[in-house]
Amino acid sequence: MEIKQHGSSDYPFQYYYDNLELFDFHCIEWHWHREFEFLYVESGQVTCGIGEKQIILSEGEAIFINSKILHRFYASSSGIIPNFVCMPEFIAPENSLIYKKYILPIISSNIYFQRFQTDELWQTKIIQTMIKIMEIQGNEKIRELATLALMQDLWLTFYENVKLSDKGDVQTVDEVAQKRVQLIMQYIHENYNRNLSLDEIASHIGISKSTALNLFHRFLHTTPVNYLIGYRLQAASWLLKNTNKKVKTIAYESGFHNVDYFCRLFKKRYHL
């Protein structure tokens, strides 16, 4: 799970105005967090990887991603995606009736995303409320109070219209499979800078190598080893941009013990 804190403990809401063109490979890589997320496509076309699904969002569409769900965003060119993440208890205290009756049933359900398009009246209302939330972020005088009021309005519309048993645009997830993928990813994130084998990665969560391969193919469309290499290269890229360390040092700190091999992979990945 992401370690990064979104918002603060006394105001667990955070707004981002992201342009995918500014990210490496026009991509916000696979991640998950306890906050649920609402994302709007202001311009461009964005591919959302959510669990095992690939959803293409066009300009003017939006999406809800539930708490702790694995997701990724990609655009072939520019993709402007204003978005906000929010702790469930921002809308109402965790021990309150409001939370237990209207929030918990959704965040603890097997719904993992809901797409919003303008051909449904209630979905149009959700999108309009999202835009209001984004616009109010520039108003320092009433930002926090207005954001809370609008979030409660948004959630009311969402709760009134989403049906937990729907099999249409509301999508469900294989929770056990996703949890295994997340555990493997977390293990890689914590141990990428040392020698790791597929056997060790799989045995860490008590599954076979073939099961680990199948899970990563289903969810991430890659292998655990290729994901490990990609994560190491991502870590190396950050060190190259933000430190004055020598290439050899960066290679070793990123888990590569052959500098020539590291340089070949890095140049290939970043088209140098």
Per-range role (PLM):
Residues G60, T211-F216, Y261-F262, F266:
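Short hydrophobic/aromatic patch on the recognition helix
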Residues M1-N19, L70-E135, E160-S165:
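A hydrophobic/aromatic-rich effector-binding and dimerization subdomain
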Residues Q186, E190, N195-A202, I207, ...:
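Terminal helix-turn-helix DNA-binding modules in bacterial transcription factors
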Residues I106, W155-V162, I188, F216, ...:
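Hydrophobic recognition helices of helix-based DNA-binding modules
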Residues M1-A62, K68-I69, A75, Y99-K100, ...:
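Generic protein-terminus/edge-of-domain signal
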Residues L121, Q137-D153:
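All-alpha amphipathic helical-bundle segments outside canonical DNA-binding/catalytic cores
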Residues W122-K125, V173-I184, L220, I229-R232:
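N-terminal positioning helix adjacent to the helix-turn-helix/winged-helix DNA-binding module
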Residues E253, D260-L272:
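…primarily DNA-binding HTH/wHTH and HhH modules…
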